[in-house]
């Protein structure tokens, strides 16, 4: 079930606890039905923190709010994300989302926001081109900023991560490498989407930290020019 080990997963929960909110796409909700919460105690959180310099005040568990990008409002109202109390669930949908889906999600406590969509064109074969509608990341981040959010943990999956990378809407990358080789030509890439046409257009990273976590590797990097960006709004 897990590619990474317990130490890496514990560190991932630290990231959840130290951000204002975490963001996923509808694909993650439908495939995994996750709770998207921090499952560490206060003492476990303090012990697991890699950067001890931020322990200048008591650490308490912060359950991050949840942001779901869901164009058509397909999030089931029985999803486990609604099981955690005292946090907000934001669902961003397109103008084409059925009104009854918006109403159903609002009835179970979600805050639903309609945002603009952008069209991307993708070649399905050599002679067929299809239009794909994607929610505007810029519009979403603007609205989240208006709500007071300063740090968002984007957990994926591949399509969501590519949306942020392609629009340069990211400051920091934390990735984990497991110790198992799986392979496969059909394997899902960490960053999907269209990719960049040239190295010059591609975002460049500045690596700042690497750490071995019980035979896994944790790598931390910033997008070049964003090293000083404040990315942790909660502690």
Please identify what each model-predicted range represents.
Residues 1-235:
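Enzymes that bind and transform nitrogen-containing heteroaromatic metabolites
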């Amino acid at each position: 079930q897990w590619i990474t080990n317990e130490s890496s997963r514990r560190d991932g929960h630290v990231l959840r606890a130290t951000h204002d909110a975490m963001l996923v796409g509808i694909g993650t909700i439908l495939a995994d039905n996750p709770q998207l919460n921090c499952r560490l105690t206060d003492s476990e959180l303090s012990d697991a923190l890699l950067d001890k310099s931020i322990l200048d005040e008591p650490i308490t568990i912060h359950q991050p709010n949840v942001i779901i990008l869901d164009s058509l409002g397909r999030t089931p109202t029985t999803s486990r994300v609604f099981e955690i109390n005292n946090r907000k669930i934001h669902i961003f949908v397109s103008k084409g989302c059925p009104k009854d889906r918006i109403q159903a999600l609002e009835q179970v406590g979600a805050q639903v926001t309609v945002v603009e969509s952008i069209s991307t064109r993708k070649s399905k074969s050599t002679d067929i081109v299809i239009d794909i509608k994607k929610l505007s990341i810029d519009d979403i981040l603007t609205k989240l900023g208006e709500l007071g959010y300063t740090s968002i943990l984007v957990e994926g999956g591949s399509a969501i991560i590519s949306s942020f990378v392609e629009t340069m809407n990211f400051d920091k990358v934390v990735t984990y490498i497991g110790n198992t080789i799986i392979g496969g030509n059909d394997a899902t890439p960490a960053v999907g989407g269209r990719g960049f046409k040239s190295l010059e257009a591609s975002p460049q990273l500045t690596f700042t930290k690497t750490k071995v976590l019980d035979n896994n590797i944790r790598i931390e990097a910033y997008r070049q020019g964003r090293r000083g960006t404040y990315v942790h709004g909660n502690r």
